[in-house]
A protein has these predicted regions:
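Cytoplasmic helix-loop-helix junction between adjacent transmembrane helices
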Residues: 127, 133-171
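Juxtamembrane intracellular "pre-TM" segments in multi-pass secondary transporters
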Residues: 2-13, 222-257, 463-465
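C-terminal ends and interior cores of transmembrane alpha-helices
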Residues: 93-123, 327-341
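Helix-to-loop junctions at the C-terminal end of transmembrane segments
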Residues: 69-84, 304-317, 405
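Glycine-rich segments within core transmembrane alpha-helices of 12-TM secondary carriers
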Residues: 162-188, 386-398
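Extracytoplasmic gate region of multi-pass secondary transporters
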Residues: 37-41, 251-305, 362, 366, ...
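Symmetry-related core transmembrane helices of the 12-TM Major Facilitator Superfamily/SLC fold
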Residues: 194-213, 427-445
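C-terminal transmembrane helical hairpin of 12-TM major facilitator-type secondary transporters
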Residues: 318-365
Length: 465
């Protein structure tokens, strides 16, 4: 008897990697905008008179709608109910709208001299409007992120799943790296902080078009799946139900990954928001080059995240990889907190080390979620993880660090390039980041113990032999 070999479009390496590259560009553009203001804190102080509290408030606005209005969770439910194509296009469009509002707020003079008091907080009107645009953008980029995660699972499950997720993260972080290393020179070349934001806006428009292109690929994949099942008796796949949310929330392994994610990203993303000023004020790096040192971190992950993802695919040890990454995070931030270690070469060494830790944890964490959660619930499961991450790492922690710097860490002022800047002592913030690493290590061990108990297979390879 001859066995019929049934293949789908996802079995073509060229097809699945092409699909990945298309959606990865959209995330590249999104990550660029997410961090484009990070090296501009000093320039915002000089040109727009933003202090560290203003900057921290603006940075924390990224998660406002995702956290308080639950837009991210709704986005995950929409993804599971409406599908990848609808959700991907919608989220890419929302990113463009948010970027446009942010650009207008920073570039216009209509808001000059105005201050708004909303609920309990008073900030310049320009800060509020820029924060609003960033919050709208945050909805789009986070929903796009969970959509792309589900895209990768759809195309790569049973293949190079962790490698694909690692490469997507690497391409996205190339956007972060370029933002950190190019936004300040671009702003200075054009004479205003709004210039790099305009470039981001144009890139996001191209990213929106990229999702239109992906939709054709996705339709072809669905058609090939239907064709491969002709003549077979296929049980209908269970649809997502609202009670599945309770099943996700009742999964202890999911909680450990979620808390680990929030703690890990709390130790990295908020740090990057303030890292350029840290390089200038503590390590004496010239302002034009200060963003290049934090830019080493995402550049390192471009190589290392796919490498560790490929290692997880072939060798396993996902929980152990997350433990090692957490240990490196602790080591790096503790050394950053030591005031006598203030030479620029030490900053480079620590940033490269942080890049290794930053590569280890996500390369194993994101591909582990499909081992714990059924595929029909993945969109909502990722959305809930991202919601907690938004609430803690992307909203609360940046605002908290900005408040700590403004309240407890001002030690005077300094003249840089002929202009006055506030001088900060970064010891307390670095110790806060260190504590996040310690807690992340605890939950990484708890996850490994839960995997041993439940048999999720986090320590097993992803590629089917």
């Amino acid at each position: 008897m001859t066995e019929i070999i049934r293949t789908t479009l996802r079995d073509s390496k060229a097809a699945r990697w092409t699909a990945l590259l298309i959606v990865a560009f959209t995330m590249f553009a999104g990550y660029y905008l997410a961090d484009v203001m990070s090296p501009l804190e000093g320039l915002l102080d000089k040109q727009l008179h933003w202090n560290s509290a203003d900057y921290g408030w603006f940075t924390g606005a990224y998660g406002w709608f995702n956290v308080f209005l639950f837009f991210l969770i709704f986005g995950g439910i929409i993804l599971d109910k409406m599908g990848i194509r609808f959700t991907g296009l919608t989220s890419a469009f929302v990113m463009v709208v948010g970027a446009a509002v942010k650009y207008w707020a920073v570039s216009t003079h209509m808001l000059d001299g105005m201050s708004w008091h909303i609920i309990f907080w008073s900030f310049p009107a320009q800060v509020w409007m820029a924060a609003l645009g960033f919050a709208v953008f945050g909805v789009g980029v986070e929903v796009a992120g969970i959509t792309v995660s589900k895209v990768i699972v759809k195309w790569f499950k049973g293949h190079e799943l962790a490698l694909a997720m690692g490469l997507q993260l690497a391409i996205a972080r190339l956007g972060t790296a370029l933002a950190l290393s190019t936004s300040l020179p671009i702003a200075k070349a054009f004479g205003h902080v709004s210039a790099p934001i305009l470039i981001c806006l144009l890139m996001l428009c191209i990213g929106l078009l990229a999702f239109f292109v992906y939709n054709f690929q996705d339709k072809k994949l669905d058609a090939s799946v239907v064709s491969s099942q002709e003549g077979l008796v296929i049980e209908p796949e269970e649809e997502f139900r609202m009670k599945d949310i309770l099943n996700i929330l009742g999964n202890k392994g999911w909680w450990y990954i979620t808390i680990l994610c929030a703690l890990f990203y709390s130790a990295v993303f908020p740090f990057l928001k303030f890292a350029t000023n840290l390089m200038i004020l503590k390590y004496g790096v010239a302002e034009n080059w200060a963003g290049s040192i934090p830019g080493l971190l995402p550049f390192g992950t471009i190589i290392l995240t796919p490498f560790f993802g490929n290692l997880y695919d072939k060798k396993g040890k996902g929980a152990s990889i997350m433990i090692l990454g957490s240990i490196i995070i602790i080591f790096v931030h503790f050394l950053f907190s030591l005031s006598f270690l203030n030479h620029w070469s030490i900053a480079i060494f620590l940033m490269i080390s942080l890049g290794i830790g930053f590569s280890l944890v996500p390369s194993a964490m994101w591909p582990s979620v499909p081992k714990i959660i059924p595929e029909r619930q993945l969109g909502t499961a990722y959305a809930l993880i991202f919601w907690v991450q938004n609430a803690v790492a992307l909203m609360f922690v940046p605002a908290f660090i900005g408040w700590v710097l403004h309240k407890y860490c001002i030690v005077g002022s300094v003249i840089i390039d002929g202009e006055k800047m506030t001088q900060y002592n970064y010891t307390i913030p670095m110790l806060i980041f260190t504590s996040f690493g310690v807690l992340a290590l605890v939950f990484a061990y708890l996850l490994k113990a839960e995997d041993k108990k439940k048999g999720y297979g986090l320590e097993l390879p992803n590629v089917k032999s």
